[in-house]
């Protein structure tokens, strides 16, 4: 239609725009204001008060965690043609305990915990496991199946254990307000594609982790920083926050 006459299509479009605008406008009513914001419940950790330190530790390094290490270590021993490794769950628990002790009682080598000299020997370690058995488990201990490699994950060798720890952290978390996320460094001086150097940090060399924590320091979730994956995330920074995968 020519001239000043408006087409039916234009009239329909104008009517639609007016209807949309009227829907978006708030409808005000008179009355007293009532606060509708509910109070977030406080976390209840009373069930952990009667637990020992060992019991709490087992909430995270649980039976499933230990059995997975046993199965994968036996699998790797078979891969190396050692059919009689016979690694047990109790041995894996003892092995982990020795690793914890070695973090506090630092010696030039692991063999020194069984040294004949009293100034080197650690009786708690030497009486819990034989030296040769410990070194054998060191050779066989494995966290994942070598036939199932994820080329996109630099942490594939420990990914199953990381996922189990994440599940345990989530299961034992009591929801609360004021969670925060930030970077955390795990000291490491060896060679790995994920090792970082951050100048000005108390721990300059090691693995950088994205962590979600409560105000009291409880670790809710975590993820290892991997540059390739991080670059993919940064390409979407206008749409997603960097540590979106922690939620």
Regions found by a protein language model. Name each.
Residues 1-245:
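N-terminal initiation segments
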């Amino acid at each position: 239609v020519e001239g000043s006459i408006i087409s039916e299509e234009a009239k329909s479009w104008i009517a639609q725009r007016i209807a949309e605008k009227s829907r978006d406008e708030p409808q005000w009513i008179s009355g007293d204001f009532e606060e509708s914001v509910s109070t977030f419940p406080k976390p209840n950790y009373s069930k952990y008060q009667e637990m020992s330190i060992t019991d709490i530790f087992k909430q995270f390094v649980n039976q499933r965690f230990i059995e997975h290490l046993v199965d994968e270590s036996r699998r790797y021993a078979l891969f190396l043609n050692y059919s009689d490794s016979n690694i047990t769950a109790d041995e894996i628990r003892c092995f982990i305990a020795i690793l914890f002790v070695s973090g506090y009682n630092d010696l030039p080598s692991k063999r020194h915990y069984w040294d004949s000299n009293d100034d080197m020997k650690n009786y708690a370690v030497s009486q819990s496991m034989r030296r040769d058995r410990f070194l054998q488990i060191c050779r066989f201990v494995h966290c994942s199946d070598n036939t199932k490699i994820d080329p996109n994950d630099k942490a594939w060798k420990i990914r199953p254990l990381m996922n189990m720890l994440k599940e345990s952290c989530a299961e034992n978390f009591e929801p609360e307000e004021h969670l925060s996320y930030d970077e955390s460094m795990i000291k490491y001086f060896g060679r790995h594609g994920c090792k970082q150097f951050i100048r000005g940090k108390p721990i300059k060399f090691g693995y950088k982790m994205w962590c979600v924590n409560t105000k009291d320091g409880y670790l809710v979730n975590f993820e290892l920083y991997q540059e390739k994956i991080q670059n993919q995330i940064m390409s979407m920074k206008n749409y997603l926050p960097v540590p979106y995968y922690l939620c």
